[in-house]
């Protein structure tokens, strides 16, 4: 087998391979034997058909199968011997085959790039420094109280903390518009669920009043026909309800986790907040490191690898929105191309960090990560046991831990500065992605 490799555009390569005629002929004879074992020819018993008839009937198909198999086998032998870092499937182009002669063909394919990391010392990372305060815990307890709140009807004017039941009709240029009308609509004030100015226009009014509110739809509003439009809403305020918060009693505390006292509840809340904070800070640092890696190493990636990643993103998008699997092919590849390219780049760069630093996954850290995940559930032992029985889930955690270890290696060489943040700031940024 002789090998000649050409470098084409970008990461494309072409290899010309030759298969010895004797090897083809030997494989051809074996293929005919397989046909002879199973061939059904009138006048002959199974397995007793003469070779000449087998060759006459099946010779062309057998030779085509042999040539196809030899192209596959010979190419992948070359991949191994030449240590080709193959990306995607090859395209085979056979040359004209002459019976009794050597068979040559070309295989066109892509390779993964040889990555040499650079500029790690130029990566800038801001490391958040956050302390969970008593006020943060108080605020979280207030959230829990609001979740258990009851409502009492009130004759007083509506405030920003009340709940109101309203009828409304929206008008633009004096005409009603689609989606701008509702009856007995329950609105929890102060949550910003309506467009700016809507809730503010209700504050100060009492049950039974009818009034108008003038508002303007935001320029970034989701409905194209309403963006930036001035509107008037005719409001009927049917009911105003005040929020009644429960007292911090043992009965209230027992509704949340295993705590029996307010002090135990506060400790449990702080533990959960610390876990959420750790995850948020880790994700924030990892994101900065990855952004820096890509900026400093804007590597070329194989088109085939991008195409494979696009298919993954398509399937994930369909699953996320509850669609049928066959809908994935209908989603335009352009929607996912940029994300797919970045994911391939990130994967290659992190793999290079792992390989060049000979990083091995820390199994103790894997188990600790699983324990941390389990601690968020009421029965952590059951969650840990579930991971122990599910190799795929455990492998996912291993991959996460391995990436974290790679990020930490890069972090050692990056420019790291610390900046103080509040708990709410970090969690708000985490929610925004």
Swiss-Prot record:
Keyword Lipid biosynthesis among record annotations: no
Keywords: Cell cycle, Cell division, Chaperone, Cytoplasm, Isomerase, Rotamase
PROSITE patterns: FKBP_PPIASE (PS50059)
GO biological process: 'de novo' cotranslational protein folding; cell division; chaperone-mediated protein folding; protein transport; protein unfolding
Disulfide bond positions: none
Subcellular location: Cytoplasm
Residue span, PPIase FKBP-type domain: 161-246
ATP-binding recorded as keyword: no
EC number: 5.2.1.8
GO molecular function: peptidyl-prolyl cis-trans isomerase activity; protein folding chaperone; ribosome binding
Reactions catalysed, as given in the entry: [protein]-peptidylproline (omega=180) = [protein]-peptidylproline (omega=0)
Pfam family, one: Trigger_N
GO cellular component: cytoplasm
Function: Involved in protein export. Acts as a chaperone by maintaining the newly synthesized protein in an open conformation. Functions as a peptidyl-prolyl cis-trans isomerase.
Family: Belongs to the FKBP-type PPIase family. Tig subfamily.
Notes concerning its domains: Consists of 3 domains; the N-terminus binds the ribosome, the middle domain has PPIase activity, while the C-terminus has intrinsic chaperone activity on its own.
The protein, known as: Trigger factor
Organism this protein belongs to: Haemophilus ducreyi (strain 35000HP / ATCC 700724)
